[in-house]
Each structure stands twice: as structure tokens, then as C-alpha cells.
């Protein structure tokens, strides 16, 4: 399957095909010098598969985790290109998750004012969200994505076969972003998650429309948008009511949920990409509509910054040894190497909850719990509020946020970091 992101001269294809990693040389122009960037948490064979298809590959493995989105690593990659005498006719390829894509994309955007960039995402989060849209960035001063550029890839290759090496927690981390898309823009996709959460399984296609219906829904206008004073409109399609999972059977029900979701992963990725594709085509540089993709991210980034300061970079991702141990394991294995700290998608899951209307929140929380995502967390509310003030969505006039009044709907509003801080008790663990 090929989806085209229609951006005029910057248009590009998203290739969704099992096994396309081995076809990278045929699908991308790699007959030149290529900087292949991956990280220590990605099975090295993925990057080597790409490198073997290049005329001249320079493979660099950075440390896994947010610490690699730094000025130092950014400079090291640029220096590698200088020393290898890369020209503007050469290119950069990212093979990894969102961190690798952000870093490598910004390197491509910066070297000689821009060289070709190809993105090959290897995590669910990157496949459903961060690999398309052109956002590239590194962190600065302890805050996420403070330095970056909008720089579109030449092509994105999505190979679902690479997901077989991911532990379940990494799958859940990515599915949080798919739930985000569903909440604001795709009631049928939310219905898929809700049915799985309620029953632990469903028949093929239950709660989902056809591929054509997915395209129609997206083309009709992603989600149901409104500004703070406007009325919202709904997409076609409805989601069924959820049944709260029995806490005593939470582990076994989570197993059932993932067993049910796994055959539908391609559908989840496709529908999420259709939502984001439509948004990016309408608002490439986040002047308006694209802000809906930040749903859950303002509070989520605040929690994430707090977590990184609290636990340190040793917990910024799974260890290389844990990743290698998971390499031969089946998809949806139960554990990974992180013992403390939250992943980005887990923080987004928390960040969505306070910004949903109460009836939406009542339906969202069972879905998040069924996926194994957090719905509460212990944190210092004042520290999280302070981090929100440094979020890139903050300005002198306040903080732009997305709220969810109803499934498949959204509003864009202005508020303050202090007002968001007042919402934090909804996700803050109560002291014993």
C-alpha cells in the first residue's frame, strides 16, 4: 500500500509493505553516499540491511534514549558527514524510532542547508505518528524539541515485520499515539480499541470501516474541529460503549486484548497515518489544524521532562542487552529493560486524560488500562507545571491546548500553565 502526502514540491510517498526494508535500495535512491543512523536499541541487522543496499554507506549507532537528541550528538553526526566528504547530492537514512528520526532528520535538514532524508521507522510510535510530517528536532537545556526544523522526508518505508522484535510495552507506547488520533479524529478507530478493552477480543473488522471508508472519513475533514468559540462537527461512524475491565483479571485481559489487536495492527497504523497525512497536508507548519496532533503532549511533555530529571538518562529507553534479548522473541512480549521512568507514549496517555470531557474520560481510561498504559502517576505537580511553562506550545499569551469534548471531536483553546497544573490531580497518584 502507498499513501501520498500531498505537499506540492515536497510531496512524498509512505510505503506500507511487509518486507520493504529489504527493498530499500529499489524504493529509495541509495546509489550515493548515505549516512545510516540507528540506535543501540534497534537490532543492528535492520540498519545493516539498509547499508548493504547503499553505494557507500556510513553507519552510525547512537546511544538509545533522549540523551542522543543533543547538540553534541547532532554535531558529531554532522562532523562524520564532513569528514566523509558528503555533498548536497548525498542523503541521510534513519532506521529506528522517533528519537532516531528526529535526530537524523534534523541532521539532514542542517547539512549544507539540506540533503535528502529517508525515514524507516522501526517502532509502532514512529510508524503511526512521528515518521511523517517533517518535524525534526533535538533537545536543549533539559526540555524536549527546543531546536529543530520542519523538513519533509523524500520517502517513508513502513515494514510491519520489524515490529516482531518489540516488547509489549513498546507496542503500547506507540498505540497511545494511535488512541490520540482516534479520540480527536476517528471514531471507528476508537471503537476498535474500545471493543478490545471491553471484551478482550472481537471478530475481524469489528468496529472498523473499510479502507475506502477510512479514506472518506479522513478526506471529510480530520476529526471534528472547533476553536474555543466554535461548534464542533463529528465524523461519520460511532464507537460502542466500553465495559470497565475487572481489575482482578487485568493481566489476563491485557493478554487477550493484545492477542485481539495484533492482527489489526496494520489497520491501526494505516488509519492513524491517514489522519496525520490529512492534517499535515492542510497545515504543514502547525499554524492551526496541525495543533490537534499535540493532544495530550503539553501535559505529557511536562511529565516526561520531570521523569527524565528524576530518573536520569539511564532510563531513557530499554538497554541494548534487553533489546537484543527481545530480538528473537515473538511480538507483544510482556516486559522490557526499563524499570523506572515512562516512555513518551505513556506520558501522552497521561496527558490526554485531564483534557477530555468527563464522559470521554470515562471511556478512555478503560482503553488505556487494557493496553497496559498508565492512568495515574506519582509526580511533583509544581515541577511538572514548571516544565509546561517551557513547552514550545507556550507563549506570552498562554498555552495552546487541544481538548476533547466528545469522541471524534476536538477544540483548540488558550489556557495557562497554572490552569493545566490545577488539572494534574486527575492523573496524580494519591498518597497512601
Model-derived regions, located:
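Short glycine/serine/threonine-rich phosphate/pyrophosphate-binding segments
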Residues: 99-106, 127-128, 301-302
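Residue-level signal for inorganic ion chemistry
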Residues: 17, 36, 70, 121, ...
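ATP/NTP phosphate-donor binding region
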Residues: 1-91
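Non-catalytic interfacial helical region
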Residues: 78-95, 104-119
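Small-residue-biased low-complexity repeat regions
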Residues: 205-233, 241-242, 246-249, 319-321
Amino acid at each position: 500500500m502507498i499513501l501520498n502526502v500531498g505537499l506540492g514540491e515536497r510531496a512524498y510517498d509512505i510505503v506500507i509493505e511487509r518486507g520493504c526494508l529489504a527493498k530499500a535500495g529499489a524504493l529509495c535512491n541509495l546509489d550515493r553516499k548515505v549516512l545510516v543512523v540507528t540506535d543501540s536499541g534497534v537490532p543492528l541487522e535492520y540498519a545493516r540491511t539498509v547499508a548493504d543496499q547503499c553505494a557507500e554507506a556510513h553507519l552510525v549507532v547512537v546511544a538509545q534514549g533522549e540523551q542522543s537528541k543533543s547538540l553534541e550528538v547532532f554535531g558529531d553526526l554532522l562532523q562524520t558527514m564532513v569528514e566523509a566528504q558528503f555533498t548536497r547530492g548525498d542523503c541521510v537514512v534513519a532506521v529506528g524510532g522517533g528519537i532516531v528520526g528526529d535526530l537524523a532528520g534534523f541532521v539532514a535538514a542542517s547539512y549544507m542547508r539540506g540533503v535528502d532524508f529517508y525515514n524507516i521507522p522501526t517502532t509502532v510510535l514512529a510508524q503511526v505518528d512521528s515518521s511523517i510530517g517533517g518535524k525534526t528536532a533535538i533537545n536543549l537545556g533539559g526540555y524536549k524539541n527546543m531546536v529543530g526544523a520542519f523538513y519533509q522526508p523524500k520517502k517513508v518505508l513502513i515494514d510491519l515485520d520489524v515490529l516482531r522484535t518489540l516488547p509489549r510495552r513498546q507496542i503500547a507506547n506507540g498505540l497511545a499515539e494511535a488512541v490520540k488520533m482516534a479520540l480527536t479524529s476517528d471514531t471507528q478507530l476508537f471503537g476498535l480499541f474500545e471493543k478490545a478493552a471491553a471484551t478482550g477480543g472481537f471478530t475481524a473488522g469489528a468496529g472498523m470501516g473499510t479502507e475506502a471508508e477510512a479514506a472518506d472519513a479522513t478526506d471529510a475533514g480530520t476529526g471534528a474541529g472547533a476553536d474555543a468559540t466554535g461548534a464542533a462537527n463529528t465524523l461519520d461512524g460511532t464507537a460502542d460503549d466500553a465495559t470497565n475491565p475487572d481489575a482482578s483479571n487485568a493481566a489476563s485481559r491485557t493478554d487477550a486484548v493484545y492477542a485481539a489487536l495484533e492482527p489489526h495492527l496494520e489497520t491501526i497504523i494505516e488509519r492513524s497515518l491517514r489522519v496525520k497525512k490529512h492534517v499535515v497536508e492542510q497545515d504543514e507548519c502547525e499554524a492551526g489544524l496541525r495543533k490537534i496532533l499535540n493532544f495530550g503532549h503539553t501535559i505529557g511533555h511536562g511529565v516526561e521532562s520531570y521523569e527524565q530529571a528524576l530518573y536520569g538518562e539511564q532510563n531513557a529507553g530499554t538497554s541494548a542487552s534487553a533489546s537484543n534479548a527481545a530480538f528473537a522473541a515473538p511480538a507483544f512480549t510482556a516486559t522490557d529493560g526499563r524499570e523506572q521512568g515512562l516512555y513518551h507514549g505513556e506520558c501522552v496517555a497521561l496527558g490526554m486524560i485531564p483534557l477530555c470531557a468527563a464522559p470521554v474520560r470515562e471511556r478512555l481510561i478503560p482503553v488505556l488500562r487494557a493496553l497496559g498504559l498508565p492512568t495515574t502517576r506519582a509526580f511533583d505537580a509544581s515541577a511538572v507545571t514548571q516544565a509546561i511553562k517551557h513547552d514550545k506550545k507556550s507563549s506570552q499569551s498562554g498555552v495552546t491546548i487541544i481538548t476533547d469534548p466528545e469522541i471524534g471531536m476536538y477544540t483548540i483553546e488558550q489556557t495557562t500553565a497554572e490552569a493545566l497544573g490545577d488539572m494534574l490531580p486527575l492523573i496524580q497518584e494519591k498518597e497512601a
